[in-house]
């Protein structure tokens, strides 16, 4: 293992839940306002995961007041406090960009049934 890979291994978070595109997750991340820091939640559907190792990112989409909002988070960022899987979704694609064009009930994703 070379030097860069060993440094990346030290920075990678270990306690992350497993989630895939189609899952609804809640990301609690730290926001700095002035001189104080608070935790803000962002809940939505994962529409993509990309990269690997320390530079892996994921994009979460939600509808806020009728407007679609997408936010891309680095998976191992220190600003992310926690990630919680709300529900598992059943999709057959790795990139769910088609959700951008859908509105209302058509934008819903089937829930993955667990036995």
Swiss-Prot record:
Sorted UniProt keywords: Ribonucleoprotein, Ribosomal protein
Gene3D superfamilies named among the record's database cross-references: 2.30.30.790
Keyword DNA-binding: no
GO molecular function, one term: structural constituent of ribosome
InterPro entries: Ribosomal_bL19, Ribosomal_bL19_CS, Ribosomal_bL19_sf, Translation_prot_SH3-like_sf
Signal sequence, start to end: none
Membrane spanning residue stretches: none
Biological processes per GO annotation: translation
Gene Ontology annotations for the cellular component aspect, listed alphabetically: cytosolic large ribosomal subunit
PROSITE patterns attached to this UniProt entry: RIBOSOMAL_L19 (PS01015)
Described function: This protein is located at the 30S-50S ribosomal subunit interface and may play a role in the structure and function of the aminoacyl-tRNA binding site.
Family (UniProt): Belongs to the bacterial ribosomal protein bL19 family.
Name this polypeptide is given: Large ribosomal subunit protein bL19
Organism: Desulforamulus reducens (strain ATCC BAA-1160 / DSM 100696 / MI-1) (Desulfotomaculum reducens)
């Amino acid at each position: 293992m070379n030097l860069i890979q060993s440094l990346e291994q030290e920075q990678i978070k270990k306690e992350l839940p497993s989630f895939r595109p189609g899952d609804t997750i809640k990301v609690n991340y730290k926001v700095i306002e002035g001189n104080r820091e608070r935790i803000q939640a962002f809940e939505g559907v994962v529409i993509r995961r990309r990269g690997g190792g320390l530079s892996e990112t994921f994009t979460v989409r939600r509808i806020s007041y009728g407007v679609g909002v997408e936010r891309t988070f680095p998976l191992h960022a220190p600003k992310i406090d926690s990630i919680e899987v709300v529900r598992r979704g059943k999709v057959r694609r790795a990139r769910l960009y088609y959700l951008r064009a859908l509105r209302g009930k058509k934008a819903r994703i089937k829930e993955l049934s667990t036995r």
